[in-house]
Amino acid sequence: MTARMISIYGLVLASMMASVLASSSRFQRLPQSQSVVENESVKFECESTDSYSELHYDWLHNGHRIAYDKRVHQIGSNLHIEAVRRTEDVGSYVCIATNLASGAREASPPAKLSVIYIESASVQLLGSNRNELLLKCHVEGASGDSEPLEIEWYRNSEKLSTWRNVQLDQHRLIVRQPGSDDDGLYRCTASNAAGRVMSKQGYVYQSSVKCLPRLARRKSQKVMESWDKQTFLCRGKRGGAAGLEALPAAPEDLRIVQGPIAQSIIKEGEPTALTCLYELPDELKNQRIQLRWRKDGKLLRQVELGGSAPISGHSFDSGKDALLREDARLVLHKQNGTLSFASIIASDAGQYQCQLQLEAHVPVSSSPGVLEVIEQLKFVPQPTSKNLELDAVVAKVHCKAQGTPTPQVQWVREGENNTLPDQVEVDANGTLIFRNVNSEHRGNYTCLATNTQGQINATVAINVVVTPKFSVPPVGPIETAELGTVVIHCQAIGDPKPTIQWDKDLKYLSENNTDRERFRFLENGTLEIRNVQVEDEGSYGCTIGNSAGLKREDVQLIVKTTGDGFAPEESGGDGFLVTRAVLITMTVALAYIVLVVGLMLWCRYRRQARKARLNDLSTKEAGGDQPDATGNGKGSEQEPCLSKQHNGHSKSRSKSSGDAQKSDDTACSQQSRASKKSAHIYEQLALPRSGLSELIQIGRGEFGDVFVGKLKATLVTSPSDKDADTEKQHSNSENGSGGSGSGSTTLSTLNEKRRSKTSMDDIEEIKEEEQEQHNQSGLEQLVLVKALNKVKDEQACQEFRRQLDLLRAISHKGVVRLFGLCREKDPHYMVLEYTDWGDLKQFLLATAGKVNTATAGSSSPPPLTTSQVLAVAYQIARGMDAIYRARFTHRDLATRNCVISSEFIVKVSYPALCKDKYSREYHKHRNTLLPIRWLAPECIQEDEYTTKSDIFAYGVVVWELFNQATKLPHEELTNEQVVQRSQAGSLEWSVAESTPDSLREILLSCWVANPKERPSFSQLGAALSKAMQSAEK
C-alpha cells in the first residue's frame, strides 16, 4: 500500500465517518417526489421532530450542496424552486438536518423531481406496403410519473379512432390493407399537463393505383369535335399511376371571375359570405359541371350546375367527404356560387377555395382566401364545484378559457382580501392546485379570464369531505332460529355524516315497505328484526354514502327452523337463554382460574425442590465452600434473555449421576446445568459499561440500536488468552459434570475447536498481529455496539444469542472479534470489533464517486482495480470459510455487513442496519425483515439456512464488488416480484460485466437452484487466488 493510496483512503474515512453520524431525531415531514410543469414553482418540505435542540437544515441536489440564488432558495427548512428548468433542476433532492449542539446529522430519503414539458411532434414512417401502413408519432417531451402522454391522430381534418382497418397502438398508427379511402395527409397531436402540440409536417399517403373512372356515355350524347380523338386509359403501373397530370385542361371560357377575399377577419357569432362568381359558356351548359368549395383542401360543399346527373367526387377526393356533414349554418348558392355562414364559429377558421369541375378535365380553381375568426372569450368547459378528500396530497380544479387573443387566467377566493389560503396555488395553465387538503380550504373560489375583449368569471364551491367508512360493518353470515330476534349492525363515519340504506336481495327496505312491528331501523344504522320468519332469509346489504362517495357491505341471514337443530323458545323467552349462557360462561371461567392457580403452585414447589437439590450437588462438587456462579441459582431469572444456550450444534455433554431419579427430574437437572454453563460463559464475556465512551448512533438493527464508540485499551483482551481461558473453563465444566469422562476426549475436543478457529490461517500469525495491537498502550479500540432493546421479544433474543455464539466461537482475522457483553443494566450491549474505514458498501460507493468525499484541494478516490476487488473477495471468502468450519451460518452476508480498515483488511461483521440506513435492502416476508435479494430460494420458501445459502449470498457479494455497490441486485424488480420469481425458480442471475472470465463459471454455480451443486468456500478461495495471480501478471 503506497503513501498516496493511504492518503486518498484517509479522505474516504473522513467523509464516511461524517456520513454515519446520526442524531436521535426523526423526520416529521419528509420531502416527497414530485412532477411539475416546466417554468412552474415547486416546494420540498422537510421538518425534524427534534424540537429540543437547535437544528440547521441543508439541501443536496444529486449529491451536491445547492448554491442558492433568487430562483432557488431556502425558507426555513423548506426548499423553494421558482420557474423550474428541466436542464438544471431534474434529479434527487436530500434534506440534511444537523444538530448544532452535538454536530450529529441525519439525511432524509431522496425525493425525485420530474419536469413535465412538451416541445414538438413529428410523424415518422415505420413501414408501408400493400398490406399495412405503419406510422409513429415522435414527441419531444416528458410527462413525468403523474399522467401519460395523450396522442391523437388525424387524417386530413378527420380525427381517427380504432375502427375497421385502423388501429391506434400508443404512439403508433396502423392501417391494415390500405386503399384509396385511406389516402390523405396524416398528422398527430400530443398533449400533457404542459400543453398540446401538433406535428408541423405530416405524412401524405397515396395508394399505388389511382385512376379516374369514366362514365358510360349515352348514344344520344355527343362530344365536342375538338376532343374526339382524346383517349382516357386506366392502367395501374408499378412505381406510378395515371393522375390529374394526364387530364386535359378545361376550356378557357369556363372560368371563375371573382373568388374569396384573400384575408377576412370575422368575429365569432357574426354572419359572413365567401364570393365565387363564375362564367359558364352556353355550349357547356348541358355538360356535367360541379361548383365545389374546399376548406384546407377538403371538400366542404358542392352543387350541380349543368347536366342531368351529378359527377362523382371519388376521382379527386378518394371518397373521403369528411366535411360534407349536415350544418344548417352553411348555404351554397347555385346562382352566384356564394358560400354563406349564418353564424361563424371558431372551427370555421381556415383556407377556402372554390372550384369548377368539368367531367374528365382539370378543375378550374380560384385564388385561396383565408378566414380568420376572432374567438369569443369563454370558458371551455365551464368550471364546476368539486368535493376534495380531506388530507389528499394533491387536488386540482381546472379552469380553461379560450378567446382571441389568448386570455390570462387567475383565481381569487371570496373574502379574506381575495387571497388564496396557504398550500393553494395556480399553475401556468390556470389550474387551481390544493396541496395537503384541510378544512381551511373550504369556500367559494372565482376563476377570472381576461383579454382585450374584457373579463369573464365563474365561481365554484370547494367542499372538503371525508369518504364514508364503516365504523361497525355488518359481519356474517348470521344464523338465527325462527321466531327469534336478530340484530345486524351497520355504523358509519364520514363528513358530511353518511346516510345508511338497507336492502334485502337488492330491494330497498324502509319503514314504508316493511312490517313496522318486526323491522326496526335504529338511529345509528343498525337493523333489528323481531319474530324472524323463514321468508326473512336472504342477503342483506348496507349502503353508506355522502357527497364523497358510496360503500356497501353484504351479510347473509340464515333462518333455521326447529327441525334444523334449533330448540324452540321456552316460556321465559330471551331472558332464559341469556341467563343460561351467562351461567355456563362463568362456570368455565372459574374452572380455568382454579386450574391455572393449581399449576402455578405445583410448578413453584417443583422449582424450589429442584433448586435445593442443585445447591446440594454444587456444594458437594466444589468442596462445600464454592459459591454458585450464578448467584444462588438466580442468574437465569435475572437474565431471562441470555439464560439458555440456543446454539444448534452445542449440546450438553453432562451425564446423569448414579442417583436414581425420575425422568422429568433428570431432564430438568440437565437443562439447569446447561443454563448455568451458558450463564458462566456470558460472565466471562462481561465488560463494564463505563469502559465505553463516545457512543454515536449509526442506525437501528433487528433487535435494537447500533452505535460506534471507543473501548478502553485495558479492557481489550488478547484472543489467545481469551481462548485459553474459555477452553479451560469448558474442560473444568465437563470434567466436573461428567464424572466418568476421559481426559483424552476433552483434549481431542479442544484440538478440534482450535482447528475450526484457525481455518486457512496460522493461529500464531493471528496471535502476533493482534497482540501487537493490544500492546499499544494509551490507545482506545474502535468498536461497534449492538443494543438489545427488545428484551421481551423471544425471536429478537434468540437472534441476539445466535450472533453472540457465532462471534464468540470464531477467532480469525477475516471475522470481527467479540470483545464482550455489557449486562449491568438494560439494554444489553454486544461489543464488536470495528475498523477505521467503516462498512464495505460505503467504501465502494465512495471509490465509485457516488459519495462526495472530496475536500478542499483534493479529489475523489479512484475506483478499485480488478486486483483490489479480487483481494477483497478473497478475504471475505476466507472469513466465511472460518464460519463454515466452526459449523455456523451467517444468514445476512452482504457488503453492508463487512468492514474494511485503512490497511485494506476486510472482515466479515454483522451490523445489519435493516431499520433505517439500509432499509431498502430488506423486505418484510412472513413478519420477518429479510434481505431477499441476497437469499437463496430455499431460505425464502422453507426458511432453511445452510452454508450453501451463504454461498448463494457470497455470489451476490462478488456481484456487488464488481459493480462498486452502485445498484441493487435486480433493482428493476419490486420486492414482491423478487419473492415470487425466487419461489417459482424463474429469477435469473448473471455475473457483472467486469468479472474475469476465469471466475464466471464458478460464480454462476453459486446461484444454481440445487444447493448440493454449489461450490464450497475453499473452492471459491482457490479460484480467487488463481485469478489474483493472473491479474498481477
From Swiss-Prot:
The yes or no answer to whether the keyword Transmembrane helix is present is yes
Which ranges are annotated Polar residues under compositional bias? 655-673
Task: Outline the extent of the Protein kinase domain.
Answer: 692-1028
A single GO BP:
retinal ganglion cell axon guidance
Report the record's disulfide bonds.
C46-C95, C137-C188, C276-C354, C399-C447, C490-C542
Stretches in topological domain Extracellular: 23-581
Residues modified as Phosphoserine? S678
UniProt topology in membrane: Single-pass type I membrane protein
Region Disordered: list its residue ranges: 617-679, 718-760
**What is annotated about its quaternary structure and interactions?**
Interacts with plexA; component of a receptor complex that mediates the repulsive signaling in response to Semaphorin ligands.
Q: Which family does it belong to?
A: Belongs to the protein kinase superfamily. Tyr protein kinase family. Insulin receptor subfamily.
The record, for PANTHER family, names: TYROSINE-PROTEIN KINASE RECEPTOR (PTHR24416), TYROSINE-PROTEIN KINASE RYK (PTHR24416:SF349)
Q: What is this protein called?
A: Tyrosine-protein kinase-like otk
Q: Give the gene that encodes this protein.
A: otk
